């Protein structure tokens, strides 16, 4: 059974990293179900453009520039939502991918950048939202997982390990929030065709290993709008988590995408690989 129209009417939802790609699609999905959405990213211009776009689509939207690695920014984002009357849903979506290549030669500043966004940003969002939720006796916190959340991934250690951390962090929050009325969810959207996936930086000598990425995305990738839909089921139920790429979906989507011609070169996702200059 589908959701009743306007199932989120009267609720206020914050989505971090939401001025494009998956985050914007999540904000749109929530807004179409009646929620007032607060979008955020590190670019004030991008926030303004996203708010304007959502409003043109009939979504009640507000926004604020926010670097999730800065606690003060995240607190201000929370206050932006509370200024609209309430805070009911918080989605920690902001994420960063690292330079492709072995950990032994990964630039320290790049590893730190990924950890700052994926780990510290998720903690900050959870830290400011949960006290509000616990105080009012309800609320939905959603943390976004990713490739590596269930095991090691060679040559993507910063990103994969950070997502493994997000999974354990989320499962711990769920234990701590038991019987409080607060629901904590995890969402692994699978392969989403976004700018982050289509623009990759590689260490020298490893760029050739990315040649198959377009084929993988052609088989199992999906649009941001499709990837965002399961969010609605999470925030309207007690479901703990959603994982897109199960064995079943890999078979069914793979067959469907092959038949749809997604593996043809003309239909593949554009891929831009930048080789890191180590000179």
Describe each model-derived feature in a short phrase:
Residues 12, 19-20:
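Conserved glycine-rich cofactor-binding loop
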Residues 33-49:
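Conserved glycine-rich Rossmann-like NAD(P)H-binding loop of the short-chain dehydrogenase/reductase
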Residues 44-45, 65-77, 108:
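The beta1-alpha1 cofactor-binding region of Rossmann-like NAD(H)/NADP(H)-dependent oxidoreductases
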Residues 101-103, 110-112:
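Substrate-binding pocket helix/loop in short-chain dehydrogenase/reductase
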Residues 126-127, 171:
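A short, exposed helix-loop element centered on a Lys and neighboring polar residues
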Residues 140-165, 170-171, 175-178, 191-192:
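Catalytic loop of short-chain dehydrogenase/reductase
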Residues 186, 205-261:
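C-terminal helical subdomain
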């Amino acid at each position: 059974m589908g959701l009743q129209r306007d199932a989120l009417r009267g609720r206020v939802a914050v989505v971090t990293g939401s001025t494009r790609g998956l985050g914007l699609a999540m904000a749109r999905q929530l807004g179409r179900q009646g929620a007032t959405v607060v979008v955020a990213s590190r670019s004030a211009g991008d926030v303004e453009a996203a708010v304007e776009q959502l409003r043109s689509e009939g979504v009640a939207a507000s926004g604020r520039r926010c670097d999730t690695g800065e606690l003060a920014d995240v607190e201000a984002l929370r206050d932006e939502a509370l200024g609209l009357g309430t805070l009911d849903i918080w989605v920690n979506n902001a994420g960063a991918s690292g330079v492709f290549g072995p950990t032994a030669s990964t630039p320290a500043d790049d590893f730190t950048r990924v950890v700052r966004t994926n780990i510290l940003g998720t903690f900050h969002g959870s830290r400011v939202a949960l006290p509000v939720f616990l105080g009012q006796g309800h609320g939905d916190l959603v943390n976004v997982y990713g490739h590596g959340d269930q095991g090691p991934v060679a040559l993507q250690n910063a990103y994969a390990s950070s997502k493994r951390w997000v999974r354990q962090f989320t499962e711990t929050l769920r234990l701590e929030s038991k019987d409080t009325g607060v629901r904590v969810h995890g969402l692994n959207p699978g392969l989403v065709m976004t700018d982050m996936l289509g623009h990759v930086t590689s260490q020298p000598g490893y760029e050739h290993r990315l040649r198959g990425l377009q084929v993988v995305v052609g088989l199992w990738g999906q649009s941001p709008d499709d990837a965002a839909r399961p969010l609605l089921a999470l925030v309207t139920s007690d479901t703990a988590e959603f994982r897109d790429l199960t064995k079943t979906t890999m078979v069914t989507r793979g067959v469907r995408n092959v038949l749809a011609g997604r593996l043809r070169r003309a239909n593949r996702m554009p891929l831009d690989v930048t080789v890191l200059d180590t000179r």
